[in-house]
């Protein structure tokens, strides 16, 4: 299967530091599930369903409060990382309450600079995180690095449309990116530049069509 052709939109990303992200999610952590849980529910459901078609070691980068953790099948050994210790504490509580036996580790770590060895995982998943990390293209390169050749990288994310009412709203919100803790303006081409990843599937997440799921294959 050849690489998919997708329309690209060029724009400059708003800078966000690791410190700003940590500060923002310290505020969001106590209310994240209540405010964003329903919004991301469909994306979590579809991404974990796809991930459950695989087996082996799985990395979830930007695991957050662990919304996805109870949904991974027992054939997957899951490691989750997040930059926010406040979010990770909630993920640990969720794992304990769910009695999830296949969670190998939950670690405070920067997705842009992971300490894992090359080719450590069979599949890597990044949901709702690439608009958050300080250097999204570096995060994509790291996801490729830690995934085995022939392995899979799944991305679920919001991508800006650049026009219309939604585009105007995204542009208006963009100046508040630091307080929000994510970039409302985030073009699709940002995640397509990694030479080690080949896009094999692109799917809009219904019902709201606000998120998109991308499946990449790790090139040997």
Kindly label every feature range from the protein language model.
Residues 26-37:
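Class I SAM-dependent methyltransferase Rossmann-like catalytic core
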Residues 57-113:
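Class I SAM-dependent methyltransferase SAM/SAH-binding core
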Residues 112-123:
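A short acidic, Gly/Pro-enriched loop at the edge of an enzyme's catalytic core
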Residues 137-149:
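A short glycine-rich, Lys/Arg-flanked "PGG" loop and its adjoining helix->strand segment in the class I
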């Amino acid at each position: 299967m050849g690489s998919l052709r997708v329309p690209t939109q060029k724009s400059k990303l708003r800078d966000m530091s690791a410190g700003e992200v940590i500060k923002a999610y310290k505020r969001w952590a106590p209310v994240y599930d209540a405010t964003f849980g329903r919004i991301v529910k469909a994306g979590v459901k579809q991404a974990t369903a796809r991930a459950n078609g695989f087996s082996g070691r799985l990395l979830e980068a930007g695991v957050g409060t662990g919304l996805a953790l109870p949904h991974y099948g027992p054939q997957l050994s899951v490691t989750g990382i997040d930059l926010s210790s406040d979010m990770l504490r909630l993920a640990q509580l969720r794992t304990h309450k769910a009695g999830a036996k296949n969670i190998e580790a939950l670690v405070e770590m920067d997705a842009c600079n992971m300490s894992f060895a090359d080719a450590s995982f069979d599949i890597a998943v990044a949901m709702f995180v690439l608009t958050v990390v300080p250097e999204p293209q570096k995060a994509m390169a790291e996801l490729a690095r830690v995934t085995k050749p022939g392995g899979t990288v799944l991305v679920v994310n919001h991508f800006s449309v650049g026009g219309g009412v939604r585009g105007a709203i995204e542009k208006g919100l963009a100046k508040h990116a630091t307080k929000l803790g994510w970039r409302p303006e985030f073009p699709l081409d940002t995640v397509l530049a990694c030479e080690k990843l080949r896009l094999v599937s692109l799917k809009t997440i219904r019902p709201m069509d606000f998120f998109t799921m991308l499946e990449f294959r790790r090139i040997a």
